[in-house]
């Protein structure tokens, strides 16, 4: 008989780059999870915007099992039917002409930045290597992407960092304009800064970036790792803004919980990447591709995308009512089912404590820095699950407020 597993085993065996919750989930269905002791949680964290169709969705299980019974992996010396079908679905649904598959958002962003540098080098010369990104951004944990992310706490211990990356203020087109010039090869931006506090870009800001990139022959990269695949109520957030990037990165919800990432590119951009210029062992493997193909099939429908907008209203209405009672938040913001509740000055820096109280009450939420409680639930979360989960969240807020005033 195998040894029982406990949360303490994490502290014994794992490299301590995470600080997981004190409970261990063991089973999920829809927007509900159960831990080792059988306690139920409503899941509004969604694996950090990954579980777009909830846990153990029957059609995703079927797609995975069907492919698993055929073959799992061949490597990039061969292609496969599921990955080609998935590529065609993404191309048909977006601006893209070409796709590169990988395993995560960080890998997709790494590929995008490498492509941008090579595109500029091949077309304009080695002087055009500058990358403009934004303060409080998050683009992944590779050395290149953590340098592009404008959060020194994630990068300062790993110097020397890749050179020629500068950071402007987000949503400030004048700040960006001061940095973007003819030496810039690319601008990388999140349409909504997720880890940076659930901060949506303004239309004028993204349109201004498009114009600056056009003027200076720089590529515009949209990091849609968190906002993509229906999260905002459109298949990709760029569709809200009417601003089309040259490159787009996607991951998280694309696999519905199965690891997969992708870089979407125009034909003009893609042609600079030739055999051997980039690659990955597992990217585009048939298991991930089969699942992701089913995810796109289920999410890219008017019913599902309109349902996300309806669910946004459910959340915001109930969160506003809750906030009227407890006075925790100065602002509730976001698009679709990526929602951030900004703590007011009286509770600044205590988002983690609220998330811990929420877990005790049986609801899982995220944070985005010390001042924002973040919600990224399944796109098909039911109204009953929203009501039950927010009732539990209200109980957690009541306990948090009463504890602070006692």
Curated annotation (Swiss-Prot):
Family matches, as Gene3D superfamilies: Aspartate Aminotransferase, domain 1, Type I PLP-dependent aspartate aminotransferase-like (Major domain)
Entry's Gene Ontology BP terms: alpha-amino acid biosynthetic process; arginine catabolic process to glutamate; arginine catabolic process to succinate; ornithine catabolic process
One GO MF term attached to the UniProt entry: pyridoxal phosphate binding
InterPro entries in the cross-refs: Ac/SucOrn_transaminase_bac (IPR017652), AcOrn/SuccOrn_fam (IPR004636), Aminotrans_3 (IPR005814), Aminotrans_3_PPA_site (IPR049704), Class-III_PLP-dep_AT (IPR050103), PyrdxlP-dep_Trfase (IPR015424), PyrdxlP-dep_Trfase_major (IPR015421), PyrdxlP-dep_Trfase_small (IPR015422)
Catalytic activities: N(2)-succinyl-L-ornithine + 2-oxoglutarate = N-succinyl-L-glutamate 5-semialdehyde + L-glutamate
Cofactor dependency: pyridoxal 5'-phosphate
Record's protein name: Succinylornithine transaminase
């Amino acid at each position: 008989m195998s040894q029982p597993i406990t949360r303490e085993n994490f502290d014994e065996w794992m490299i301590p780059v995470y600080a997981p919750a004190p409970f261990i989930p063991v089973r999920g269905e829809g927007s509900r999870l159960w831990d080792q002791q059988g306690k139920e949680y409503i899941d509004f964290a969604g694996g950090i915007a990954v579980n777009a169709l909830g846990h153990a969705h029957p059609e995703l299980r079927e797609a995975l099992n069907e492919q698993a019974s055929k073959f799992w992996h061949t490597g990039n010396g061969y292609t496969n039917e599921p990955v080609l079908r998935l590529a065609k679905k993404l191309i048909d649904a977006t601006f893209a002409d070409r796709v590169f598959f990988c395993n995560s958002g960080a890998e997709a962003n790494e590929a995008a930045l490498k492509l941008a540098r090579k595109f500029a080098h091949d077309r304009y010369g080695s002087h055009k290597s500058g990358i403009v990104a934004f303060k409080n951004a998050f683009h992944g944990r590779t050395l290149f992407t953590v340098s592009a992310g404008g959060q020194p706490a994630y990068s300062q211990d790993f110097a020397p960092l890749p050179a020629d990356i500068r950071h402007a203020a987000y949503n400030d087109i004048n700040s960006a304009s001061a940095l973007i010039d003819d030496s810039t090869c690319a601008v990388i931006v999140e349409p909504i800064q997720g880890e940076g506090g659930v901060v949506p870009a303004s239309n004028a800001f993204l349109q201004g970036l498009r114009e600056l990139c056009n003027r200076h022959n720089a590529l515009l990269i949209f990091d849609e790792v968190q906002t993509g695949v229906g999260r905002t109520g459109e298949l990709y957030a760029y569709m809200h803004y009417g601003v089309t990037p040259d490159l787009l990165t996607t991951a998280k919800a694309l696999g519905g919980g199965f690891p997969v990432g992708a870089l979407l590119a125009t034909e003009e951009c893609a042609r600079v990447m030739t055999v051997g210029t980039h690659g990955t062992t597992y990217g585009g493997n048939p298991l991930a591709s089969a699942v992701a193909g089913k995810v796109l099939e289920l999410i890219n429908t008017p019913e599902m995308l309109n349902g996300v907008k309806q669910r946004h209203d459910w959340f915001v209405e109930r969160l506003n009512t809750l906030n009227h009672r407890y006075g925790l938040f100065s602002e509730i913001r976001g698009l679709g089912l990526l929602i951030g509740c900004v703590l007011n000055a009286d509770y600044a820096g205590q988002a983690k404590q609220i998330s811990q109280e929420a877990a005790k009450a049986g609801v899982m939420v995220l944070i985005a820095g010390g001042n924002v409680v973040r919600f990224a639930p399944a796109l098909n979360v039911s109204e009953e699950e929203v009501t039950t989960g927010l009732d539990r969240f209200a109980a957690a807020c009541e306990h948090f407020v009463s504890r602070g005033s006692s």
